[in-house]
Each structure stands twice: as structure tokens, then as C-alpha cells.
From Swiss-Prot:
Name of the molecule in the record: GTP cyclohydrolase 1
Keywords in alphabetical order: GTP-binding, Hydrolase, Metal-binding, Nucleotide-binding, One-carbon metabolism, Zinc
Family affiliation: Belongs to the GTP cyclohydrolase I family.
Pathway this chain belongs to: Cofactor biosynthesis; 7,8-dihydroneopterin triphosphate biosynthesis; 7,8-dihydroneopterin triphosphate from GTP: step 1/1
Length: 213
């Protein structure tokens, strides 16, 4: 298949178009990334050769590798181990106030917020830390809040196969706080539901109530 053809997202939530671009052009090197930072410094009006900026390209490339580590991680690996001995527990499991940092795909500035994630188990559960790790995987990519909300829910539903999933995200977008309209403290809330959580209004109310406690 021609590498220029853009395919649909794979099951990890990572666009296959990224793989196509890599096949076509080759993955940029560390040196390429550092050179790009130097170009941005020059474009901004500063001198990348001055003492305070000499190591900045290397530091920025290293920081971006950490900030966007979600592109190299898979929710399948995180959610692959489940526990079936749950003592008959089959009610809502909620992990709330999961703090995260992401980056807006439009301006590449921070999105800072917290996620509340719940699911109705179908005779099996995962370790609570795994839910937080799934949030981190999708947060450490260029995102919109709507996308990260849907990706978290879809991955848990698809891999764990619970009876239903609920996700709420509350976040402040620096693209609104630092630039443009410059409204600090404005919060965006997104929610999504799957399975029984999608069709049962009482379960939705229970989820929303528990997140506010």
C-alpha cells in the first residue's frame, strides 16, 4: 500500500496517518528536533547562541519526548491484566480526580485538568492505577478535550469489556488563558458514556453525584 494513503485510527487511538508520514519521510532524528527548536528561537527574535539558550534545543527535545510519550504507549498493554476474583462485586468502580497535563493540538499549549473515570464491571476488574495510566497515555499526546474523553472511554470499553463506562473531564485550556481571549480560570467539562451507562439515566446521575463528593 502506498505510504501516502491515510488510513483510519487503529485500536490504540493513535492515527495511522502518523505511521504513513513516518514511512514516507522517515522519523525525524534528535538532531532534527533540536534544529527545529533553534529555528523557533530565531523566529521568536532571540539568539540560540547566547549562553542561556545554548542547551535549550536539547532540553526542549528531551521534554517533548516525555510530554508526548503517549504516542509510544498502548492501552492494550495497560489493561491486559484483569482480576476475576472480585468476591461477587459487580457495582460501579469509580476513580476520580485523576490529574493530568495534555497539550492542545491546535496551539501546542497545555491543557491542565482532572479526569473522573468509572465502569460497571462484568465479573472482572483491573488495578485502580491502570485507569490512571490509561488517562496518562491519551493525555500525553496532542489532543482536544473531546477526543481524549472519547478515547479513554472507548479503550476501556473495547479492551476490558465492562457493562458500561463513564468519563468526565474538567480542564483549563492555556490556549484560552494565555492567548486569544485570555480568560484565566475558565473550565471546560466534557462527558461521555458507553453501554449501560449510556442508556441508564439513573446510573449517569449516580456517577455525576459521586464525582462531586
Amino acid at each position: 500500500m502506498d505510504a501516502r494513503i491515510l488510513k483510519e485510527d487503529d485500536e490504540s487511538g493513535l492515527p495511522n496517518k502518523q505511521a504513513d508520514v513516518t514511512l514516507l519521510h522517515g522519523k525525524p532524528t534528535q538532531a532534527d528536533a533540536e534544529a527545529a527548536v533553534r529555528t523557533l528561537l530565531l523566529w521568536a527574535g532571540d539568539d540560540p547562541e547566547r549562553e542561556g539558550l545554548l542547551e535549550t534545543p536539547k532540553r526542549v527535545a528531551k521534554a517533548y519526548k516525555e510530554l508526548f510519550a503517549g504516542y509510544t504507549e498502548s492501552p492494550e498493554e495497560v489493561l491486559g491484566t484483569v482480576f476475576e476474583e472480585v468476591g461477587g462485586y459487580n457495582d460501579l468502580v469509580l476513580v476520580k480526580d485523576i490529574s493530568f497535563h495534555s497539550h492542545c493540538e491546535h496551539h501546542m499549549v497545555p491543557i491542565i485538568g482532572k479526569a473522573h473515570v468509572a465502569y460497571l464491571p462484568d465479573h472482572k476488574v483491573v488495578g485502580l492505577s491502570k485507569i490512571a495510566r490509561v488517562v496518562d497515555i491519551f493525555a500525553r499526546r496532542l489532543q482536544t478535550q473531546e477526543s481524549i474523553t472519547a478515547q479513554i472511554a472507548d479503550s476501556i470499553q473495547r479492551i476490558l469489556k465492562p457493562r458500561g463506562v463513564a468519563v468526565m473531564i474538567e480542564a483549563e485550556h492555556m490556549c484560552m488563558a494565555m492567548r486569544g481571549i485570555r480568560k484565566q480560570g475558565s473550565t471546560t467539562i466534557t462527558t461521555t458514556f458507553t453501554g449501560e451507562m449510556q442508556v441508564n439515566a439513573e446510573e449517569q446521575v449516580r456517577f455525576m453525584t459521586l464525582t462531586r463528593r
